Amino acid sequence: MRIEIRKDGNSTAVLISFDMDCSKFGSSYERNKFFRGLYGWEQVIKKNNSVYHYHREGVMNEVPHIKVDNSVFIVAMEEMQRVLDYFDGWENKVHWKTFQVLLTPDEVRLLEKKANESDLSEE
């Protein structure tokens, strides 16, 4: 994926990169809580010879994004604040940086498609 930095234009988005200070987390449970809140998770319950699967939503299930790497993703400019609000709750343990980027037309269409899918799933 080629990314160009630009200060204005309709196809600008935000690349968000985050890093965790593992020594500040009290336990692996707390660290997992951060990731579950961000990305969501699949809950599996086995009961009475049956298995039930439940998808628990995270912030990124609601925000259309392009995943670049494990802790790097691109979101539309208007969705950035929702992600940063979540990170603010973890500010002593998670560090992040944002970079304004210019998307190619294909990447803009991909973000729009994901936004439309997100809108349909909320109905």
Where are these regions (language model features)?
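Short, low-order "capping/linker" segments at domain edges
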Residues: R109-E123
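Conserved short beta-strand edge segments in small beta-sheet-based binding/regulatory domains
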Residues: N92-E107
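Short, flexible turn/loop "capping" segments at secondary-structure junctions
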Residues: K7-N10, P64-I66
